[in-house]
UniProtKB/Swiss-Prot annotation:
One of its GO terms (molecular function) is ATP binding. GO terms for biological process: response to heat. The gene is HSP70. InterPro entries: ATPase_NBD (IPR043129), Heat_shock_70_CS (IPR018181), HSP70_C_sf (IPR029048), HSP70_peptide-bd_sf (IPR029047), Hsp_70_fam (IPR013126). It comes from Brugia malayi. This is Heat shock 70 kDa protein. CDD domains: ASKHA_NBD_HSP70_HSPA1. NCBIfam families: PRK00290.1. Keywords: ATP-binding, Nucleotide-binding, Stress response. Gene3D superfamilies: 1.20.1270.10, 3.30.30.30, 3.30.420.40, Actin, Chain A, domain 4, Substrate Binding Domain Of DNAk, Chain A, domain 1. PROSITE patterns: HSP70_1, HSP70_2, HSP70_3. It holds the Pfam family HSP70. Belongs to the heat shock protein 70 family. Residues 615-638 have a biased composition (Gly residues).
Length: 644
């Protein structure tokens, strides 16, 4: 089997990575020791930060810290949800050519724009590196999860993100399906169970109903809303902005930094309210020197979000209808996603199922990555007993079809059809001697195509002249296991064929663009490495200078060193520290050059000192300069990366 394939849960707010090894899944902690990593990327004057480091500095740098890429990916700039999200985002989203949204930031003093795919790929690189650090070797293959309700263009764009991150994406799978694997993996031999996965995450909401029996996971239906979750935070933020306006007559909305600090406090309060009945918010000097101290009760929060909480039941009903199941037939209700910790959501769900106990046996933050890791192991040929005979049968979330006369949507593949699947239908011409047909492919549930989403179109030309209704054109829809569609059309009389992989020509990145982005990603990575080395060199010089000052002050050595030598070292060290204070952003070789200079003054004196003292008293403080963490590698001691 290939070296470990990993499973990545690429979430809207947090991401998580797992790997299947030695017969079980390991969820891997990042360099900060956290098992989930914020899906944040930040750009500063000197560096690019990803994950915790990016989220930690967001209040100081709100305009250049990008998050929620999942809400942009595979969407058009004019999309209603993109427009409404932009009101809440402190970073700038611009309309790049072809109606694609791009994020605009300042990086190292220049204005840069990035596609949502590139931002997501940076988060994926972080997850990939987290796994590599744990496994001790490079990782190539991955399974990446997406919300079940993602449409074709969103799936394709996620796959492209993987390619930009240098990953070979074995498969794109749906989050609730992945969570079901995490839930059902150890439940073999329990007979057939109908399981409802209720997945309420940081930005999306999915409900899937599966039947699990003897390692076969068959999705019966899926429903959802690609927009929910973070809206809970927005409600609380808006509530406090209004309170601040009432009490202090000031409008917070005009200040991104204040809003960001408030949002961070609201996120924390929301979590607190899942376990206590009230939370306090204390923010010093929030706006124009005014401190903001306030409380919010659980009841108040529930009232602010009442309609949102209630709306989570609609997809549950829809999924049951589509699965042709009654409430009573559901054996297990499994909670996934951080927002399912909200007591009100749990109560509504339990009441909907007539007071049924909810299943909390899996970790809601890690279940999706867990399932993805299992699927990655299966696809890369793992032979271990735990994943033997596991079969995943997923479904297409939306109906797919073509436009026929009068703008009617004719569905070839109905929603919730098990994938992979292939189906053909024969169509004909609308007018006499029509030389060609335009095949327009749509996804959605509405009767008219204008209300559905156009995926792409192509022309089948060269049809021999014939009266209307005579030519026979066979249209074939073929969905692969990633949920990505191929469409072909063939004129039966001539055998002439034309086909298109619906990769959403308008919105999709071309091969060349992906190539270019891969190279840029490499370049950014090299920049990040250089920045790390630069800081290591700076820290090395600083610690060397301070160590020297300490050495000459050492009680044991004080009298062994002449005043003149002492003064020489003292002055050179002070000069170095002064230079450091004024040149924090100098280049690596400047720091190294300064260190050599300082060593040339100190080393002869220190050597003389130790020769006269007869051997080294317990090793020289800080080690010789080579041992300081500047010599290209990170030294022995802990170096602290986070530099604000």
């Amino acid at each position: 089997m290939s070296k470990n394939a990993i499973g990545i849960d690429l979430g809207t707010t947090y991401s998580c990575v797992g790997v299947f090894m030695h017969g079980k899944v390991e969820i891997i902690a990042n360099d900060q020791g956290n098992r989930t990593t914020p899906s944040y990327v930040a750009f500063t004057d000197t560096e690019r930060l990803i994950g915790d480091a990016a989220k930690n500095q967001v209040a100081m740098n709100p305009h250049n810290t990008v998050f929620d890429a999942n809400r942009l990916i595979g969407r058009k700039f004019d999309d209603g949800s993109v427009q409404s999200d932009m009101k809440h985002w402190p970073f700038k989203v611009v309309n790049a050519g072809g109606g694609k949204p791009k994020v605009q930031v300042e990086y190292k003093g220049e204005t840069k724009t990035f596609t949502p795919e590139e931002i997501s790929s940076m988060v994926l690189v972080k997850m990939k590196e987290t796994a590599e650090a744990f496994l001790g070797h490079a990782v190539k293959d991955a399974v990446i999860t997406v919300p079940a309700y993602f449409n074709d263009s969103q799936r394709q764009a996620t796959k492209d993100s993987g390619a930009i991150a240098g990953l070979n994406v074995l498969r794109i799978i749906n989050e609730p399906t992945a969570a079901a694997i995490a839930y059902g993996l150890d439940k073999k031999g329990h007979g057939e169970r109908n399981v409802l996965i209720f997945d309420l995450g940081g930005g999306t909401f999915d409900v899937s109903i599966l039947t699990i029996e003897d390692g076969i996971f068959e999705v019966k239906s899926t429903a959802g809303d690609t927009h929910l979750g973070e809206d809970f935070d927005n409600r609380m933020v808006n509530h406090f902005v209004a309170e601040f306006k009432r009490n202090d007559k000031k409008d917070l909305a005009s200040n991104p930094r204040a809003l960001r600090r408030l949002r961070t406090a609201c996120e924390r309060a929301k979590r607190t309210l899942s376990s206590s009945s009230q939370a306090s918010i204390e923010i010093d000097s929030l706006f124009e020197g005014i401190d903001f101290y306030t409380n919010i009760t659980r009841a108040r929060f529930e009232e602010l979000c009442a309609d949102l909480f209630r709306s989570t039941m609609d997809p549950v009903e829809k999924a049951l209808r589509d699965a042709k199941m009654d409430k009573a037939q559901v054996h297990d209700i499994v909670l996934v996603g951080g927002s399912t910790r909200i007591p009100k959501v749990q109560k509504l769900l339990s009441d909907f199922f007539s007071g049924k106990e909810l299943n909390k046996s899996i970790n809601p933050d890690e279940a999706v990555a867990y399932g993805a890791a299992v699927q990655a192991a299966i696809l890369s040929g793992d032979k271990s007993e735990a994943v033997q005979d596991l079969l995943l049968l997923d479904v297409a979330p939306l109906s797919l079809g073509i436009e026929t006369a009068g703008g009617v949507m004719t569905a070839l593949i109905k929603r919730n059809t098990t994938i992979p699947t292939k189906t053909s239908e024969t169509f004909t011409t609308y007018s006499d001697n029509q030389p060609g047909v335009l095949i327009q492919v749509y996804e959605g549930e509405r009767a008219l195509t204008k209300d559905n989403n156009l995926l792409g179109k192509f022309e089948l030309s060269g049809i021999p002249p014939a009266p209307r209704g005579v030519p026979q054109i066979e249209v074939t829809f073929d969905i692969d296991a990633n949920g990505i569609l191929n469409v072909s059309a063939q004129d039966k009389s001539t055998g002439k064929q034309n086909k298109i992989t619906i990769t959403n020509d308008k919105g999709r990145l071309s091969k060349d663009e992906i190539e270019r982005m891969v190279q840029e990603a490499e370049k950014y990575k090299a920049d990040d490495e250089a920045q790390k080395d630069r800081i290591a060199a700076k820290n090395a010089l600083e610690s060397y200078a301070f160590n020297m000052k300490q050495t000459i002050e050492d009680e044991k050595l004080k009298d062994k060193i002449s005043e003149e030598d002492k003064k020489k070292i003292q002055e050179k060290c002070d000069e170095t520290v002064r230079w450091l204070d004024g040149n924090q952003t100098a280049e690596k070789d400047e720091f190294e050059h300064r260190q050599k200079e300082l060593e040339s003054v100190c080393n002869p004196i220190i050597t003389k000192l130790y020769q006269s003292a007869g051997g080294m008293p317990g090793g020289m403080p800080g080690g010789m300069p080579g041992g300081a963490p500047g010599a290209g590698s990170t030294g022995g001691g802990p170096t602290i990366e986070e530099v604000d």
